Amino acid sequence: MIPVKEVIVVEGRYDKNTLSQIFDAVIVETSGFGVFNDKEKLALLRRLAEARGLVVLTDSDGAGFVIRNFLKGAIDPALVKQAYIPDIAGKERRKASPSKEGKLGVEGMSAETLIDALRRAGATLGLSLIHI
């Protein structure tokens, strides 16, 4: 597992499950659009951003960008890094049919793609973080 200093913010539990198999990090899910009305979760994200910094990693579909933009406006941008996954057509194994936009989400990405996304976002990765 790869240690990550920042808190990783994802849309849902399947995204969180996928990332927790790769990264040793605090991972918080927004419950999709649920974060819009969840003042406690938003307050938690603000506190975590101040303490450790955040990396936002949402799906590359329209919903993911709406959530990402909401968080951009709600949390000090200086404390938030933006990680992006590529647009790849397909469907996740657990789903019977593709998403509305036909793109793979965070949960459908390979470990290498997710590691690269965090690295490109400037997340603090590495073994030296084990003692944080």
What kind of feature is each model-predicted range?
Residues P3-V7, R13-N17, Q21-A51:
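Acidic, glycine-rich catalytic loops of TOPRIM or P-loop NTPase phosphate-binding modules used
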Residues G34-V35, L57-I67:
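Acidic, metal-coordinating catalytic cores used for nucleic-acid/nucleotide bond scission
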Residues G73-T124:
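Long, charge-dense
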Residues I130-I132:
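Conserved small/polar residues in nucleotide/adenosyl-binding loops
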Residues V10-E11, T58:
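Short beta-strand scaffold positions
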Residues V66-A74:
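Short Gly/Thr/Asp-enriched flexible loops that form oxyanion-binding sites at enzyme active sites
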